[in-house]
Design a protein with these regions (language model features):
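Surface/interface-facing alpha-helical segments and adjacent flexible terminal/loop regions used
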Residues: 1-157
Length: 157
């Protein structure tokens, strides 16, 4: 079976076939083109995962800042505990990902900028506030995003 056929019919087998070729030093037999494509795809997946976690984290921080006070006044028992758990979980997931792939840290500022528009859209939809009420750029510093004690001061909006 050719490398292309193995790739199309048994991806897992193709991976281990190429791993074995690398171990044996059979560099000419390695399916370089598809291997490069897969490695690039893995890098993109890691960036996409980071952005996904940032979207949720920033959206919940925005919800906390822009609606916690209003909901707490409407429902006396509302303390935002589920929001806090979501914020904590996203921080943990992002930290885990950065620990596993430290080179992603160099992409963090760009990832926050790329995530912000989607985070605003998510927060806006969930708490039914106009997108125009949110800041045009992420109002949180990188340090604040990962500070386990940071929860933005609720606005009066």
């Amino acid at each position: 079976m050719t490398a292309q056929n193995l790739y199309n019919k048994d991806f897992y087998g193709w991976i281990y076939h190429n791993i074995e070729l690398i171990r044996l030093g059979q560099w000419e037999a390695i399916d370089k083109t598809l291997l490069i494509e897969e490695l690039e795809s893995m890098a993109k997946r890691d960036k996409h995962e980071l952005i996904s976690h940032l979207i949720i984290l920033i959206a919940y921080l925005l919800k906390w800042q822009f609606q916690l006070k209003q909901l707490s006044q409407t429902w006396i028992e509302f303390e935002g505990k589920s929001w806090k758990r979501s914020i904590d979980e996203q921080r943990k997931q992002i930290q885990r990902q950065l620990n596993m792939s430290p080179s992603l840290k160099s992409y963090l500022l760009q990832a926050v900028a790329e995530s912000y528009e989607d985070a605003v859209a998510l927060a806006s939809k969930e708490i039914q506030l106009s997108i125009t009420l949110f800041p045009p750029h992420c109002p949180y510093a990188i340090e604040q995003l990962f500070d386990e004690d940071f929860y933005p001061t609720p606005d009066d909006k």
